[in-house]
Swiss-Prot record:
Keyword hit for Phosphoprotein: no
Keyword Ribonucleoprotein: yes
Keywords of this entry: Ribonucleoprotein, Ribosomal protein
Membrane spanning residue stretches: none
HAMAP family associated with the record: Ribosomal_bL32
GO cellular component: large ribosomal subunit
InterPro entries documented for this protein: Ribosomal_bL32, Ribosomal_bL32_bact, Ribosomal_zn-bd
Sample GO molecular function, one term: structural constituent of ribosome
Protein name: Large ribosomal subunit protein bL32
Classification via SUPFAM superfamilies: Zn-binding ribosomal proteins (SSF57829)
Gene label: rpmF
Amino acid sequence: MAVQQNKKSPSKRGMHRSHDFLTAAPLAVEPSTGEVHLRHHVSPNGYYRGKKVVKTKND
């Protein structure tokens, strides 16, 4: 089992953890409907990059 040789100071511990935060998912607005969706995903209305690509229940 690995055992540390020297204690890591609170400052170094904080520097090590500085990139552990979560980031918000990037969102995009569908140009044809104005709906917000995840980037590179089809919007709930079935549109992707201004074109209808999936049939929905309302269609």
